[in-house]
């Protein structure tokens, strides 16, 4: 597992819930890949998780990965909270179901394939990778908005 991949992720939503997009910038050696997508009715947190999930899914082999996110929800959820959620059968300490459990479960399944370090970065603070991921997420969100406009 010599390969090191750096990933920047972001999510964007027009309303919460509303049309949303996710984006990720993957960097490996001197190569970069940009990916993005959208959902017509979603939340900002779902888009944040989806960005990380889709970025990890695109990796073809086990890698050392650094994931940068400006979402404390994503970073804390995957590094701290998820262990108790699993122990409590995807319920929080107050016995309420974990929001977005479907995506958390899929993201958790991807963790075993890689060695991952999760890092939080301040959003909109001149971090070029975060800025690129934000632009991709906005592109996804705008695509969703255009589709909804066409549907009338």
Swiss-Prot record:
GO cellular component: cytoplasm
UniProt keywords, alphabetically: Cytoplasm, Endonuclease, Hydrolase, Magnesium, Metal-binding, Nuclease
Assembly behavior: Monomer.
The protein's role, per its UniProt record: Endonuclease that specifically degrades the RNA of RNA-DNA hybrids.
Keyword field contains Transferase: no
Cofactor(s), by name: Mg(2+)
Cofactor: record remark: Binds 1 Mg(2+) ion per subunit. May bind a second metal ion at a regulatory site, or after substrate binding.
Family to which the UniProt record says this protein belongs: Belongs to the RNase H family.
Reactions catalysed, as given in the entry: Endonucleolytic cleavage to 5'-phosphomonoester
One Pfam family it belongs to: RNase_H
UniProt-annotated binding residues for Mg(2+) 2: 10, 134
Chief location bin: cytoplasm
UniProt-listed NCBIfam families: PRK00203.1
Binding positions for Mg(2+) 1 per the UniProt entry: 10, 48, 70
Known EC number: 3.1.26.4
PANTHER family from the UniProt entry: RIBONUCLEASE H1
Gene Ontology biological process terms from the UniProt entry: DNA replication, removal of RNA primer
Gene name for this UniProt entry: rnhA
Identification of the protein by name: Ribonuclease H
All copies of domain RNase H type-1, residue ranges: 1-142
Subcellular location field: Cytoplasm
UniProt GO MF annotations: magnesium ion binding; nucleic acid binding; RNA-DNA hybrid ribonuclease activity
Coiled-coil parts of chain: none
């Amino acid at each position: 597992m010599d390969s090191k991949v750096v990933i920047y992720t972001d999510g964007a939503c027009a309303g919460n819930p509303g049309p949303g997009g996710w984006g990720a910038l993957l960097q490996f050696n001197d190569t970069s890949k940009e990916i993005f997508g959208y959902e017509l009715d979603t939340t900002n947190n779902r888009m944040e998780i989806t960005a990380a999930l889709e970025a990890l899914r695109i990796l073809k082999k086990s890698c050392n990965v650094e994931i940068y996110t400006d979402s404390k929800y994503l970073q804390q959820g995957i590094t701290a909270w998820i262990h108790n959620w699993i122990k409590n059968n995807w319920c929080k300490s107050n016995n309420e179901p974990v929001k977005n459990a479907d995506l958390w479960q899929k993201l958790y399944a991807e963790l075993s394939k890689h060695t991952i370090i999760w890092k939080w970065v301040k959003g909109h603070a001149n971090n070029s990778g975060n800025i690129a991921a934000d632009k991709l997420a906005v592109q996804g969100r705008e695509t969703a908005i255009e589709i909804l406009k066409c549907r009338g």
